[in-house]
Swiss-Prot record:
The protein, known as: Leucine zipper transcription factor-like protein 1
Subunit structure: Self-associates. Interacts with BBS9; the interaction mediates the association of LZTL1 with the BBsome complex and regulates BBSome ciliary trafficking.
Gene name for this UniProt entry: Lztfl1
Organism whose genome encodes this protein: Mus musculus (Mouse)
Chain spans, region Interaction with BSS9: 145-299
Location in or out of the cell: Cytoplasm
Amino acid sequence: MAELGLNEHHQNEVINYMRFARSKRGLRLKTVDSCFQDLKDSRLVEETFTIDEVSEVLNGLQAVVHSEVESELINTAYTNVLLLRQLFSQAEKWYLKLQTDISELENRELLEQVAEFEKAEFVSSSKKPIIDITKPKLVPINEGGTTELLNKEILRLQQENEKLKSRLKTIEIQAVNALDEKSKLERVLQDLQLDQENQQDLLKAQDLDDLENTVATLRSEFQKTLNDKTENQKSLEENLAAAKHDLLRVQEQLSMAEKELEKKFQQTAAYRNMKEILTKKNDQIKDLRKRLAKYESED
């Protein structure tokens, strides 16, 4: 393990990147230096300058330096993105997911460690052999142990993934079939409910017709009975009135007969005749009373 906590291979990769960054940084610094040198050669030819002239010179220099520094910072950011892309692409080939901690990029202690590492590596760079900057690709290592276990685990996960996909497809088919069956059953249920409602409506209509017919029959019978009773009552009333008239007539005749009897009481033959008449009248009265009592009881 080296100063950065990396193995030798990865440390060499870091050194190559730092060499690349130092080279780009040196070029940009030379560009900035040339900006100042050009300014000296082209503008600082007079012995004295006015305030406006000094301001103009400094503003021009500021614009040039600002452009160069901004370009370098942008280029550095893009370069770092490309470097991360290479690392992530190689990790994805091994089904790995790398994570970064952005907050560590501003860790002052770690930055100082990197500075010390750069100083140790490049201050005496003339005494060290130049390392080949060609970056080797991260290729699978044909060794046992961890690599073999990782390959087996990847293969097992792939097989399990295929099984899960197959099972998911089967479940989806079953779910679709179940939904179709549910839809069919719902349609059948709706049809049955509709038929039941129609039958209930038909039965209700039939029951209503039967009830109306029954009510009509009962009403007709009641009206007939009422009419018969009315006619019978009318007949009884007529018979009663006739009987009363007959009774009054007989009573009148009886009264007349009694008066006549008093006149002819001394006449024996007449008396006998009158007695016979009186007896007959009494019999008629009894008969009429019986008839009258019978009619009154029926009423």
